[in-house]
């Protein structure tokens, strides 16, 4: 007699699997009827598996960050070292926030995971979406870590077809179904290779949507790229004219009395930095050091892992903001699956004394091509959604006597034009902000009504750009849904 679910239990939350149907895995999610029937349907339509299109599959590794000088370098002389964040569901690689390795590492330690044009790159490890796929563009030379694989297909159009296919939500659900592991899910090679592939799907709808999305993103970028120019112009700050970068142009001299007792860092005294600093004083508005506006200042804390047992009367679980959450374009990126929740001691939370309009400064981190010192602001919306703390790599300031949002936009521009680059030191591959110099930097201070005018204008530009990006994202999502529905209806 078949088992019947008791009436007091919602039947839509319960499903029954016969013992004979168990496939060696005991996670309930694997046997959920909706995903099981979806996979059965996809397999019934497919005649091939991913392995049938792969000439070779290889994974990489991550060279030790403790030996930065041995393995890594800058973008000018280095080879792109791809990570999961460089993969996109539109099938294209993003080289923003890219790390670079030297040629010896590329041709030695990581020779087996070299990436060439038209190779298919697929995510196999990590939280969030599984099997994100991107195609290496024409002329590309790169490498990758262990969290994705390089699949050589030998054919450009085939790689693009497979990327479109793997980036469909219904196929991602199948890939995620076969991943294992709790805190860091992984898709092993046998499971990856056995992903069913349906041939001859018409992806023209997605191609058209991608083109429209790209056009909207380009318009958004134009708007965002003009923000720094607008802010500098309205403050009367004229950027120094760029000169050629010959060796002779980069050589400069400094009087000994200027460096006596100070730090021997050529960046601090370089002609470009000196000219940038001088340009601030050309503004007709008042100037004050940042420290004049700071009324509270506090370092962060990393706390304890959320899996640890703690006395909940003495600790609070918080979303701990790290440098990873700093968005180079907007503010903080907290709506992803990579955020960290940790236990923070209540006494330390009290010292942090977090309020809306507090500014967070990245004091340690950065990369070869990205100075440390990025800035973010805690808005009412952020504080309403989560109990917030911040890591020991972040420093918080509370200001008065100046519009906090204006100060946020101003400091963001100062970072973008590389003034912050002169306020840091570097040890073991990690950049550290020299806080005393950062707090002593010059702030151009127009009257409060002018500050608000600047804030309103920049906020409106960012809003327009965000709307364009969201429109592009929606167009692509709808196209994918149409293609997926055509597959399901077969």
What is each of the regions a protein language model found here?
Residues 1-68, 194, 199-306, 440, ...:
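Non-catalytic DNA-recognition/assembly elements of restriction-modification systems
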Residues 48-71, 85-117, 288-310, 324-359:
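Sequence-specific dsDNA recognition surfaces
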Residues 78, 97, 145-147, 317, ...:
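A generic structural signal for short beta-strands and their flanking turns/coil linkers
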Residues 83, 104-106, 110-113, 117-166, ...:
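A short beta-sheet element
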Residues 88, 127, 201, 366, ...:
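Flexible, active-site-proximal loop/turn residues at the rims of small-molecule/cofactor binding pockets
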Residues 124, 149-184, 189-226, 405, ...:
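Ordered, small/hydrophobic-rich secondary-structure cores
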Residues 141-149, 160, 180-203, 384-395, ...:
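A short glycine-rich beta-alpha junction/loop motif
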Residues 170-173, 262, 283, 415-418:
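Short glycine-centered helix-capping/turn motifs at secondary-structure transition points
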């Amino acid at each position: 007699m078949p088992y019947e679910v008791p009436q007091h239990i919602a039947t839509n939350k319960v499903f029954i699997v016969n013992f004979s149907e168990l496939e060696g895995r005991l996670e309930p999610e694997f046997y959920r009827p909706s995903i099981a029937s979806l996979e059965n349907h996809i397999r019934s339509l497919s005649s091939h598996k991913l392995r049938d299109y792969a000439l070779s599959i290889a994974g990489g590794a991550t060279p030790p960050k403790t030996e930065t000088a041995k393995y890594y370098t800058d973008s000018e002389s280095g080879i792109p070292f791809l990570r999961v964040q460089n993969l996109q569901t539109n099938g294209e690689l993003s080289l923003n926030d890219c790390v670079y390795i030297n040629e010896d590492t590329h041709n030695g330690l990581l020779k087996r995971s070299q990436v060439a044009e038209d190779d298919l790159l697929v995510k196999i490890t990590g939280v969030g979406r599984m099997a994100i796929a991107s195609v290496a563009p024409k002329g590309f030379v790169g490498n990758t870590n262990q969290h994705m694989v390089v699949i050589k297909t030998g054919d450009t159009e085939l790689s693009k077809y497979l990327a479109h296919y793997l980036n469909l939500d219904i196929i991602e659900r199948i890939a995620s179904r076969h991943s294992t592991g709790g805190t860091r899910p992984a898709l092993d090679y046998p499971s990856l290779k056995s992903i069913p592939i349906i041939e001859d799907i018409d992806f023209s709808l997605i191609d058209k949507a991608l083109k429209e999305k790209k056009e909207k993103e380009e318009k958004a970028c134009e708007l965002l790229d003009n923000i720094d120019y607008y802010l500098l112009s309205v403050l009367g700050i004229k950027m120094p004219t760029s000169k050629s970068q010959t060796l002779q142009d980069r050589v400069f001299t400094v009087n000994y009395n200027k460096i006596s007792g100070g730090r021997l860092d050529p960046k601090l005294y370089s002609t470009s930095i000196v000219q940038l600093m001088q340009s601030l004083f050309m503004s007709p508005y008042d100037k004050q050091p940042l420290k004049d506006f700071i009324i509270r200042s506090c370092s962060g804390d990393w706390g304890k892992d959320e899996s640890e047992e703690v006395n909940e009367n003495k600790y609070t679980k918080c979303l701990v903001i790290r440098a990873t959450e700093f968005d180079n374009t907007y503010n903080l990126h907290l709506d992803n699956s990579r955020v960290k929740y940790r236990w923070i001691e209540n006494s330390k939370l009290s010292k942090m004394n977090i309020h809306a309009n507090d500014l967070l400064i990245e004091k340690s981190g950065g990369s070869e091509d990205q100075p440390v010192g990025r800035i973010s602001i805690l808005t009412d919306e952020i504080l309403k959604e989560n109990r917030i703390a911040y890591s020991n790599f972040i420093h918080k300031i509370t200001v008065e006597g100046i519009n906090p949002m204006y100060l946020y936009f101003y400091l963001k521009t100062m970072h973008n034009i590389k003034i912050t680059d002169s306020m840091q030191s570097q040890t073991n591959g990690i950049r550290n902000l020299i806080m005393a110099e950062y707090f002593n930097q010059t702030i151009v201070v127009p009257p409060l009504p002018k500050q608000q005018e600047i804030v309103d204008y920049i906020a409106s530009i960012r809003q327009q750009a965000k709307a364009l990006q969201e429109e592009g994202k929606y167009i692509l999502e709808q196209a994918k849904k149409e293609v997926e529905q055509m597959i399901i209806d077969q």
